[in-house]
Regions:
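C-terminal and inter-domain tail/linker signature
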Residues: 1-141
Length: 141
């Protein structure tokens, strides 16, 4: 196995572990996949940097969507990243910003760039269409 193949395999294992930990609501395990925890949510402009902020993101997102889960669609490698397409699904059970909960489910196709420095995961940068989720949660057409 080449060095590049070894690096890609190790990175892929980290990303899969991270996504599985989120689905199992084992946020300490998901946090542990980072060398330095950082989330960048591009649709909202929010950045959560460091363990305390990333834990806050986990608490807030899972309070609104306690059954939030991801389903991997595809995974690709770049020089410094693993790029993942996935379905994110959940049911809103508590307020999300100004959106009151109506018990509605959402499903949104998303992309995440898991950014690496060498073998270390240092950032998850997530891209999605927030209007898709808002429409499903509010029932607007």
């Amino acid at each position: 196995m080449s060095n590049l193949q070894s690096i890609r395999l190790a990175r892929e294992r980290i990303v899969r572990e991270h996504m599985e930990a989120e689905n199992a609501l084992e946020m300490h395990r998901a946090l542990g996949t980072f060398a330095h925890p950082r989330y960048e949510i591009m649709a909202t402009g929010h950045v959560y940097d460091g363990p305390e902020e990333v834990n806050r993101y986990y608490r807030e997102s899972r309070a609104a969507f306690p059954d939030q889960r991801n389903e991997l669609i595809s995974l690709r490698h770049a020089d410094d990243a693993v790029i993942v397409e996935f379905w994110l699904r959940g049911t809103q059970k508590s307020p999300l910003g100004r959106l009151d909960p109506k018990g509605r489910e959402f499903q949104c196709r998303m992309a995440a760039f898991f950014i690496f420095e060498g073998a270390d995961l240092v950032c998850e940068r997530v891209y999605f269409d927030s209007a898709t989720i808002r429409r499903q949660l509010t029932g607007a057409s």
